[in-house]
Amino acid sequence: MVAHRATRRKRASATQLYKTCKLSGTCPEDVVNKIEQKTWADKILQWGSLFTYFGGLGIGTGTGSGGRAGYVPLGSRPSTIVDVTPARPPIVVESVGPTDPSIVTLVEESSVIESGAGIPNFTGSGGFEITSSSTTTPAVLDITPTSSTVHVSSTHITNPLFIDPPVIEAPQTGEVSGNILISTPTSGIHSYEEIPMQTFAVHGSGTEPISSTPIPGFRRIAAPRLYRKAFQQVKVTDPAFLDRPATLVSADNPLFEGTDTSLAFSPSGVAPDPDFMNIVALHRPAFTTRRGGVRFSRLGRKATIQTRRGTQIGARVHYYYDISPIAQAEEIEMQPLLSANNSFDGLYDIYANIDDEAPGLSSQSVATPSAHLPIKPSTLSFASNTTNVTAPLGNVWETPFYSGPDIVLPTGPSTWPFVPQSPYDVTHDVYIQGSSFALWPVYFFRRRRRKRIPYFFADGDVAA
């Protein structure tokens, strides 16, 4: 096995050591010689430079210039450089003749600047004359404008883009803005009413929220998952598990024994109940319903194995106690509120509105109960205030017929031009009670408005 070697820390450089130890005088000799260039290599270079000079050759400079003349290719001659002196303008030299004066004037006469005319001389000694004047008229300017006609015109343009909608112009003087209304009371009758306002103040610190906090929606609390495969299921039959669970694990503790909290125990070798062997914790109880019963559950943890470091390893056990079963819901027999005799299944109104749920009975209808007839009844009645008209029926079923008031339609005049009466025909109610007829399902099931439909009788059946 290769031993692990510690990482080697980098030593400080000579420059860093020289900066820290030079002031205290504790620098090693090799560090001082290297920084101050006192090594043997530095001394040999210093002594050799006293006898040799390579300054013009550019050796060791690193510039690559090749000295003053530069590099020359092998087998060729260097080019000749001719220095050209720049041309300068000639200086004019005036010759001095024998007859010229030897004194040179510094200022020529042409360079004298004339300052202009001379100062005039004033004559007389009388002095100046002072003239004073006095006026009694005040210096007031007449600013009254001339008589003229002035026309003043103004134009008011309302732009809806620059009008604040919340602002309402009240018919009174004052200042109106989007947030503040400063007004003064005026006399007269207006279309508004002044209502005294009251301040609804709440005593508080001033940091209360200005809006209500919405109550979050109903959140379903997840039920404890006590029936997983990781938990060992143990059924307890001792009732002491409900109020005194500690008596099943260890000896009683007269000082404290919580019934709705988690309990912790020290590992012991012997337990009063063998199902609670090596239990070190019992969690708080939970009531659940499973398979038609109320169940009292606690989750426990065992300490079967303990390591040298003190870590406890064990299974998790679900202890449950069935309190009582949930009885099934009792079935109650329902009784009808109305008797079976009050039935209107055989009553129909062919002219009534089909949308009506239950048509009423007419006072002029003639009802024939089926209990007094040996055959199926079929009764036809018409509501009218005039004569009776009897319509014969077929003798297929020998249906008895009772005459009653019939319908007499009003007739128009025989003279020309014919003017119909208003209304020409009135709406009549016809009630048919019995079971020996059939209504056409097209008109019976369709929800339509009130409408007159033709009808006729054939062999005792009514078809509409």
UniProtKB/Swiss-Prot annotation:
One of its GO terms (cellular component) is viral capsid. A motif (Nuclear localization signal) lies at residues 1-12, 445-453. InterPro entries: Late_L2. The keyword Lipoprotein does not apply. Disulfide bonds join C21-C27. One of its GO terms (molecular function) is DNA binding. Highly phosphorylated. GO terms for biological process: microtubule-dependent intracellular transport of viral material towards nucleus; symbiont entry into host cell; viral penetration into host nucleus. Keywords: Capsid protein, Cytoplasmic inwards viral transport, Disulfide bond, DNA-binding, Host endosome, Host Golgi apparatus, Host nucleus, Host-virus interaction, Late protein, Microtubular inwards viral transport, Phosphoprotein, Viral penetration into host nucleus, Virion, Virus entry into host cell. Its main location: virion. It holds the Pfam family Late_protein_L2. The keyword Disulfide bond applies. It is found in: Virion; Host nucleus; Host early endosome; Host Golgi apparatus. Minor protein of the capsid that localizes along the inner surface of the virion, within the central cavities beneath the L1 pentamers. Plays a role in capsid stabilization through interaction with the major capsid protein L1. Once the virion enters the host cell, L2 escorts the genomic DNA into the nucleus by promoting escape from the endosomal compartments and traffic through the host Golgi network. HAMAP family: PPV_L2 (MF_04003). Interacts with major capsid protein L1. Interacts with E2; this interaction inhibits E2 transcriptional activity but not the DNA replication function E2. Interacts with host GADD45GIP1. Interacts with host HSPA8; this interaction is required for L2 nuclear translocation. Interacts with host importins KPNB2 and KPNB3. Forms a complex with importin alpha2-beta1 heterodimers via interaction with the importin alpha2 adapter. Interacts with host DYNLT1; this interaction is essential for virus intracellular transport during entry. Belongs to the papillomaviridae L2 protein family. This is Minor capsid protein L2. It comes from Human papillomavirus 56.
